[in-house]
Curated annotation (Swiss-Prot):
Pfam families, A to Z: Gelsolin (PF00626), Sec23_BS (PF08033), Sec23_helical (PF04815), Sec23_trunk (PF04811), zf-Sec23_Sec24 (PF04810)
Keywords: Cytoplasm, Cytoplasmic vesicle, Endoplasmic reticulum, ER-Golgi transport, Golgi apparatus, Membrane, Metal-binding, Protein transport, Transport, Zinc
Protein localization: Cytoplasm; Cytoplasmic vesicle, COPII-coated vesicle membrane; Endoplasmic reticulum membrane; Golgi apparatus membrane
Name recorded for this polypeptide: Protein transport protein sec23
This protein's record includes keyword RNA-binding: no
Native source species: Neosartorya fischeri (strain ATCC 1020 / DSM 3700 / CBS 544.65 / FGSC A1164 / JCM 1740 / NRRL 181 / WB 181)
Assembly: The COPII coat is composed of at least 5 proteins: the sec23/24 complex, the sec13/31 complex, and the protein sar1.
InterPro entries: ADF-H/Gelsolin-like_dom_sf, Gelsolin-like_dom, Gelsolin-like_dom_sf, Sec23, Sec23/24_helical_dom, Sec23/24_helical_dom_sf, Sec23/24_trunk_dom, Sec23_24_beta_S
Role played: Component of the coat protein complex II (COPII) which promotes the formation of transport vesicles from the endoplasmic reticulum (ER). The coat has two main functions, the physical deformation of the endoplasmic reticulum membrane into vesicles and the selection of cargo molecules.
Disulfide bond annotation, renumbered to this chain: none
GO BP terms: COPII-coated vesicle cargo loading; intracellular protein transport
Gene that this sequence comes from: sec23
Membrane topology classification: Peripheral membrane protein
Binding site for Zn(2+): C63, C67, C86, C89
């Protein structure tokens, strides 16, 4: 099968099962697996939308303990004897009574060959309706606060009618609003400079009275009972009160001197929000949505002092360990994040500020709980408003496209073991025979909790081969390795659902089996390696991580390239490997690993989003797409992400996922400024100028978070966003004297892709390794 046909096959599997594997044939032995360099791993999107798939209204059939695998198309079913053999543990299980009518030609949906992914609606109801607690920063300008209030009031109409809503505001003090008290505005005030233990919060709010017990769930869709009912009200009953309270919100009255920052107690407000839900709604789906317009400057979790002369920490400060508040703040927010994750509650962070807000310190609140993270310049921006509204997108049945209180468990056959997960989750510390000896990401477990989950939430799951090799290792007949992903989550409709995805792939034959190399999915592999690199970058120095990326690339090319000894020019890669070095070139230059020109908050945001998206979107972040428009051809033409693609008579459309940029070449910009497009006879120029805008609108249509939209001209200041992403094939050092200018010259010391590939070829050929060891500054 040729590469294009394989790509189509992998794409069909992704559409059906929401999964992409780095290797689609598994090695037979651990030794063979170690020689692959790129680990056996999967990018899995549990809730990938499948509108044609039926929702089964009965409980799944599971194998006996301790296996607990769910019946799937790979199970061997004996219709006459009414038994099925589990492909994971090979145990025989009786079929339940309601399967009595099945025959060879009439089988239930979960046994159909195409039902490798199936979803069940479980009988177990959710313990409470979805809960939304808005935590609002009042230390902001009037116009920004008004815009935020308007957006929050609008969001009330997007919530399910039975959803519970609470409101906490904070500035110098944190206030919990008692929405159930209608006589006048009433709130409980917490001092911003004081750290409150969980029990203190609960005592002050009067939450220690008898409430719903964890093992006694209340009826779904009913309003809460007990003390929490004063603070959390159903939208359908209390929309008027909640709207009134939001409309009456005022700026924090505490005076702020010109040389000071506002006193902002973000840590106390978050601590109170976590404590409020922890007592009354443990393991019930809920979201704490934080809207902050500046850094925390007092109380627990503050990231900078109130004096403006004291700057926010930079990457340089962190590298030099010149960080006065950082470690204490991280410890505080991490403890809150663990509490929220253990209770099944999501924390979303929405920042509307030109300066940093402390996202770096708070990042694990979102990372541990599967929350959203959004970085915008202001709450007045359309980027914030449209992104926030998209959080509440609904499906065809008018249910929110979000799952609550989710967990993911991975089962494997004896050939495979799970080594870990990289994504927005925490470990459930569940041990089983599927758990591997090594650790990659969040390891030593086969189950993870990811309180918040949506249709684009994707996770990198990593595996190892269990077989040590030896004479008994290779067994006769076709062999396969299998994995099953079990995702339990609270659906927005009020019931728990279970989505089951079962994956089977062949095992390779003897050492040197060519099917192994042919099964390499370079796109999935690039994204999975990028996740490992970002995971490492959070704990290691940036240069060390880049060196690791380079080493892995050299080893992979050395293993799978064709070349002649001592001849770098003979270096060739098969079609399914050719783009991988290019992906790694752009990854090592990306904002995920290069922190220069980015604040720590921006780096935390970019890495958060990368770990949330599937293969297609993550690849756009690593290697942006570039399209060209000109009068010579109709529509857009994909072009190389290279400085040579900049032409005076062309318009370029760059998509980096975070930015959508339209760049007008020098001549096009002059024509536009002269107004030719508005004159008769120049309709083709007008159409040319409009086409990239139309395409940009399509790109923006379903993207979260909404990207920043930039329109610029050659030579303009905003053009730097494009130039920083291009391969610098034409720099100030490469142009010949007096040569004609046909492309943009980029002033940079970065090496070009061609130079990078030249060095890769030298390093990948073992006998050439000594030749390049004497290079002064090898780029790889």
């Amino acid at each position: 099968m040729d590469y294009e046909a394989l790509k189509d096959q992998w794409s069909d599997v992704e559409d059906r099962d929401g999964i992409r594997l780095s290797w689609n044939t598994f090695p037979s032995t651990r030794m063979e697996a170690s020689r692959l360099v790129v680990p056996i791993a999967a990018v899995y999107t549990p809730l990938k939308e499948k509108p044609d798939s039926p929702l089964l209204q009965y409980e799944p059939v599971t194998c006996k303990a301790p296996c607990r695998a769910v019946l799937n198309p790979y199970a061997n079913v004996d219709v006459r004897a009414r038994i099925w053999i589990c492909p994971f543990c090979l145990m025989r299980n009786p079929l339940p009574p309601h399967y009595k009518d099945i025959t060879e030609n009439a089988i239930p949906p979960e046994l159909h060959p195409q039902s490798t992914t199936i979803e069940y609606q479980l009988a177990r109801p959710a313990p409470a309706p979805p809960i939304f607690v808005y935590v609002v920063d009042t230390c902001q300008e009037e116009d920004s606060l008004k815009a935020l209030k308007d957006t929050l009031i609008l969001s009330l109409s997007l919530l399910p009618p039975n959803a519970l809503v609470g409101l906490i505001t904070y500035g110098t003090m944190a206030q919990v609003h008692e929405l159930g008290y209608t006589e006048c505005a009433k709130s409980y005030v917490f001092r911003g400079s004081k750290e409150y233990a969980a029990k203190q919060v609960q005592e002050m709010l009067g939450l220690l009275a008898a409430g719903p017990r964890p093992n006694m769930p209340q009826q779904p869709a009913r309003p809460p009972v007990g003390p929490a009912a004063r603070f959390l009200l159903p939208v359908q009953q209390a929309e008027f009160q909640i709207t009134n309270v939001l409309e009456q919100l005022q700026r924090d009255p505490w005076p702020v001197a010109n040389d000071k920052r506002p006193l902002r107690c973000t840590g106390v407000a978050l601590s109170v929000a976590v404590g409020l839900l922890e007592t009354s709604f443990q393991n019930a789906g809920g979201r704490i949505m934080v809207f902050t317009s500046g850094p925390a400057t007092e109380g627990p979790g503050h990231v900078v002092g109130p004096e403006l002369k004291e700057p926010m920490r930079s990457h340089h400060d962190i590298d030099r360990d010149n960080i006065k508040y950082y470690k204490k703040a991280v410890k505080f927010y991490d403890a809150l994040a663990k509490r929220a994750a253990n209770n099944g509650h999501v924390v979303d962070i929405f920042a509307g500020c030109l300066d940093q807000v402390g996202l770096l310190e708070m990042k694990n609140l979102a990372n541990f709980t599967g929350g959203h993270m959004l970085l915008t310049d202001s709450f007045t921006s359309s980027q914030f408003k449209q992104s926030f509204v998209r959080v509440f997108d609904k499906d065809a049945n008018d249910n929110l496209l979000m799952g609550f209180n989710a967990s993911l468990e991975v089962l494997t056959t004896k050939e495979l073991k799970v080594t870990g997960l990289i994504g927005h989750a925490v470990s459930l510390n569940k041990k089983s025979s599927s758990v591997g000896e090594t650790e990659c990401g969040i390891g030593n477990t086969c189950a993870w909790k990811m309180c918040g989950i949506d249709p684009s939430s994707s996770y990198g799951v990593y595996f190892e081969i269990a077989n040590q090799g030896g004479p008994a290792a290779v067994q006769p007949g076709p062999q396969r390795g299998m994995m099953q992903f079990l995702t339990y989550y609270q659906h927005a409709s009020g019931h728990y659902h279970l989505r089951v995805t079962t994956v089977a792939r062949p095992l390779s034959g003897p050492t040197g089996d060519p099917t192994l190399a042919q099964s390499f999915d370079q796109e999935a592999a690039a994204v999975l390696m990028a996740r490992i690199a970002v995971y490492k970058a959070d704990v290691d120095d940036g240069p060390d991580v880049i060196r690791w990326v380079d080493r892995m690339l050299i080893r992979l090319c050395s293993r799978f390239a064709d070349y002649r000894k001592d001849d770098p020019t003979s270096f060739r890669l098969e079609k399914n490997f050719t783009l991988y070095p290019q992906f790694m070139f752009h990854l090592r230059r990306s904002q995920f690993l290069q922190v220069f020109n980015n604040s720590p908050d921006e780096t935390a945001f970019y890495r958060h989003v990368l770990n949330h998206e599937d293969v297609g979107d993550a690849l756009v972040m690593i290697q942006p797409t570039l399209d060209s428009y000109s009068l010579e051809h109709e529509g857009s033409q994909p072009v190389l992400l290279d400085s040579a693609s900049i032409q005076p008579t062309h318009i370029l459309l760059l998509d980096t996922f975070f930015h959508i940029l339209i760049f007008h070449g020098e001549t096009i910009a002059e024509w536009r400024k002269a107004g030719y497009q508005d004159q008769e006879g120049y309709e083709n120029l007008k159409a040319l100028l409009e086409q990239p805008k139309e395409d940009a609108r399509e790109l923006i249509a379903d993207r979260f978070p909404l990207p920043r939209f930039i329109v610029c001209d050659a030579g303009g200041s905003q053009a730097r966003f494009l130039l920083s992403k291009l391969n610098p094939s034409t720099t100030h050092t490469t142009g010949g004297y007096g040569g004609g200018v046909t492309s943009q010259t980029i002033f940079t010391d970065d090496v070009s892709l061609q130079t990078f590939m030249d060095h890769l070829m030298k390093y990948a050929i073992p006998t050439c390794f000594t030749i390049v060891m004497n290079d002064a500054n090898p780029p790889i």
